[in-house]
Amino acid sequence: MPLAVELAGVAFGYRPGQRVLEDVDLRIGEGEFVAVAGPNGGGKTTLVRLALGLQRPSGGRALLYGEAAHRFSRRRTLGYLAQRTELGGYAPTTVRELVAAGRLAAGGLIGPMRRRDRELVSEAIERVALADVADAPLRTLSGGMQQRAFIAKALAGEPSLLVLDEPTTGVDAESQESLAALLDRLHSELGVTILYVSHEFGAVERFVERLVLVRRTIIFDGPPSALPGVWHDPSHVHA
């Protein structure tokens, strides 16, 4: 299977002698749906940023589709939803405007969108079941619906890799389940590689093919069914 992400012997520290990650080996094949979990401060967000080339490792190598991640030439094919705790300047933006901005950014477009671009925006909104509120400001929507809108923004760019960092922050349990089911459907329909990053993995566990637990290094990598029973207790993972 061709690799979308490869980390080999990766280490990283913000200061000399203080490692956030060390000896990380991770390979994610094209088309996989993988969850990365671990305690806050355990290095999972740093791992993702290294994988995407947003930071460079102190040691080892990080590759995206076979290229050095920090020099990846097809960055517009990546959909990255960074951890977000509030809407900020997005509050008055409508769903359609947000998704259109994603299409414009991915296509490097300036000025009015072409017909095909408008179609992709509408398709992305429909895929996340927000067509009925496409012209509503984000601030009027629930947390779960807001997160769907940001997923649609990423989808409008036709990504080959979709990365979500803590997508369920501030979202209730029912919306977490709904979001996980949506990602599973998108994975099946589009064949996109999905990397789901969270300190909790319960909502997505039954949908992913692999679960990767990170606590400074990778302490588990395999199917959720192979996870030792004690690890299903979040207090154990977060210890």
Q: Model regions: which residues?
A:
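H-loop (His-switch) and adjacent beta-strand-loop-beta switch element
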Residues: 209-223
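H-loop/switch region of ABC-family ATPase nucleotide-binding domains
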Residues: 198-199
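Conserved catalytic motifs of ABC-family nucleotide-binding domains
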Residues: 158
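Catalytic Walker B motif of ABC-type/P-loop ATPase nucleotide-binding domains
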Residues: 162-165
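Helix-to-loop junction immediately C-terminal to a conserved catalytic motif
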Residues: 52
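Conserved ABC transporter NBD signature motif
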Residues: 60-74
